[in-house]
Amino acid sequence: MKKQFRLWLTACSAFFVAGHSVFLSSCNDDLPAASYYTFTGEMMSDYLKSREDFSLFARIVERAGEMDFLASRGGRTLFPPVNAGVEDFLKEYGYASVEDIPEAYCDTLVKACMIDNSIVYTYNLTETSQQKNELDLPLVIQTTGDTVDANGMVLSIVNRRAAIINELKNDSVENGVCHPVSKVLVPSTSL
């Protein structure tokens, strides 16, 4: 009986070791370099970083801690102000530089010019269109034909403050669309 028990125990141990060697061994995934995928698309964060005319707004986005969000997947619409618009904002509100804007207000400024989960192209807009920004405040876009740029093209005005720059509008990126504007969109509840 003892001999049968040892034989049975030895057989079970052998099966146990053999079984675990199958489950505990790892596979070798040495794939050729051509098999790996490298994303090469441009996200909103890349759009801001790669264009010198958005360097001041890109710094506001960095200070707000939102650059990673603009690098993430999704579908959003961004109205980034050009450097001249940011400089006008700094003068208007008494800031010497972007670094003087409180970080919490930087976050507010970024969210004021962003529509998340919605891609809005200007050619889909009616004469007056209203969207909610990230602060849940209205972005009113008026394209009435009353205001034209130097080339005679009709301008779209956002919140009666900033004009969408016609030469740069509807610029698609992997995670949405950018409509550069002439001024910083400040949050407002009275439109």
Describe each model-derived feature in a short phrase.
Residues G19-K49:
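Bacterial Sec-dependent N-terminal signal peptides
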Residues E52-D53:
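Hinge/lid segment of periplasmic solute-binding proteins
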